[in-house]
Design a protein with these regions (language model features):
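Conserved Rossmann-fold NAD(P)-dependent oxidoreductase catalytic core, especially the SDR/UDP-sugar
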Residues: 79-124
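N-terminal Rossmann NAD(P)H-binding glycine-rich loop of SDR-like oxidoreductase domains
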Residues: 3-21
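Conserved catalytic-site region of short-chain dehydrogenase/reductase
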Residues: 60, 95-111, 126-132, 144, ...
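Flexible, glycine-rich beta-alpha linker
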Residues: 31, 101-103, 126, 150-174, ...
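Short-chain dehydrogenase/reductase
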Residues: 71, 75, 119, 123-135, ...
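NAD(P)H-binding glycine-rich loop region in Rossmannoid oxidoreductase-like domains
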Residues: 32, 36-74, 87
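Active-site Tyr-X1-5-Lys
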Residues: 80, 122-155, 174-185
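C-terminal substrate-binding subdomain of Rossmann-fold SDR/epimerase-dehydratase oxidoreductases
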Residues: 14, 20, 181-303
C-alpha cells in the first residue's frame, strides 16, 4: 500500500502521533463536525486509506457535564468522515471505538460480539452510543457498498502527546498532571474516587503498531479489541505515577467523587489468534515513559 496515500484524522493526538506514516490532519486543518469541511479536506488529500482517530474525548467529569456536546460532536465527526471517505473512493478505513460502547450490566469478559447487548454505563452513555453508531455505519456500508472499512476497540490508551488536562483528560494523563503539580507546589495529590475501580491500559505505541497491522491484514466485519487483558486498580496506577514522578507527599482520595464504572475486563483472544507473539509494553514502563515525556514537554503538552 502506498503510504503517501494514507490519511490520519486526529493525527496530532495520542494515537495519531504514534503512527509513523501518513498525512496527519488536526482540527486546524478542518472541522470534521461540518460536512463541507470534511468532504473538502478528503477531496483535497485524495487518500487511498484513512485511519480515523479524531474524536471528542474526556474523562468521567467531562462525560457527565457535557453529554450533549459529546454526543453531537462525535456523531457528526464519524458520520461525516465515513460518508466522505465513501464518496471520495477511500479503499480502506479504520475507525476507533472505545470499550465504553459495551453494556454496563453484562457477563465479563467483554468480547467483540457483545457491543449491542445492553445499555452502556450511565456516566458516559452519550459518547458510548455515538461510538456504537460507528460500528453500525461501517457494517451498513460494507453490506451496501462492499467497502473494506473496519473498526478497532482499544482499551484505555495512554502515552506521549496525550491530553493531560485535569478537567477533561482521561484518567491516567490527568493523574500524571495532578501529580506533577502536587510535586512542584508541595501540596497533596488529590484523586477522585476510592481508587478501587479496575482498568486495562494500553500504551499508544502498541496501539499504533496494531493499527498498522490492521491496515494491511484485518478485513473482518466484526471489530477487533486491542487489549493486554491485564487489569490494574486506579490505586495501583497512582502508585506507579507517584514512583515515576518521584512524588513524596500525601495522596488524598476524594471518595465523595464518582468512581465511574467499576470494571470492564475485555478478552484479547481474537487479537492473540492473529498475533500470538505480540509484546505489549508493561504498564510500569509505559507510565515511566509517559511521565518523563510530560515533564520534559510540559510547556507544549496539551493541558
Amino acid at each position: 500500500m502506498d503510504i503517501q496515500k494514507l490519511l490520519i484524522t486526529g493525527g496530532t493526538g495520542l494515537v495519531g502521533s504514534a503512527i509513523s506514516t501518513g498525512t496527519k490532519l488536526s482540527s486546524q486543518d478542518a472541522d470534521l463536525t461540518i460536512w463541507e469541511e470534511t468532504y473538502g479536506i478528503l477531496r483535497q488529500e485524495s487518500p487511498d486509506s484513512i485511519i480515523h482517530c479524531a474524536a471528542r474525548v474526556g474523562g468521567v467529569g467531562s462525560n457527565i457535564n457535557y453529554k450533549g456536546e459529546f454526543f453531537f460532536e462525535n456523531i457528526m465527526i464519524n458520520t461525516n468522515v465515513i460518508e466522505a471517505a465513501r464518496i471520495c473512493g477511500v479503499k480502506k478505513l479504520i475507525a476507533f471505538l472505545s470499550t465504553c460502547v459495551f453494556p454496563d450490566d453484562i457477563e465479563y469478559p467483554l468480547t467483540e460480539s457483545k457491543i449491542h447487548s445492553g445499555e452502556p454505563h450511565s456516566s458516559n452513555y452519550p459518547y458510548a452510543y455515538a461510538k456504537r453508531m460507528v460500528d453500525i455505519q461501517i457494517r451498513a456500508y460494507r453490506e451496501q457498498y462492499g467497502l473494506n472499512y473496519v473498526s478497532v476497540i482499544p482499551t484505555n490508551v495512554y502515552g506521549p502527546n496525550d491530553n493531560f488536562n485535569i478537567d477533561n483528560g482521561h484518567v491516567l494523563p490527568a493523574l500524571i498532571h495532578k501529580c506533577y503539580l502536587a510535586k512542584n507546589n508541595n501540596t497533596d495529590f488529590s484523586v477522585w474516587g476510592s481508587g478501587k475501580p479496575l482498568r486495562e491500559f494500553i500504551y499508544s505505541e502498541d496501539v499504533a503498531k496494531l493499527t498498522e497491522w490492521v491496515l494491511d491484514e484485518y478485513d473482518e466485519d466484526e471489530p477487533i479489541i486491542f487489549t493486554t487483558s491485564e487489569e490494574i486498580s486506579i490505586k495501583d496506577v497512582v502508585g506507579l505515577i507517584v514512583d515515576a514522578m518521584g512524588y513524596e507527599g500525601k495522596v488524598n482520595w476524594q471518595e465523595d467523587k464518582p468512581d465511574g464504572q467499576y470494571r470492564k475486563p475485555s478478552d484479547n483472544s481474537k487479537l492473540k489468534s492473529y498475533l500470538p507473539d505480540f509484546k505489549f509494553t508493561p504498564i510500569d514502563v509505559g507510565i515511566k515513559k509517559s511521565v518523563e515525556w510530560f515533564v520534559e514537554n510540559y510547556e507544549k503538552a496539551r493541558k
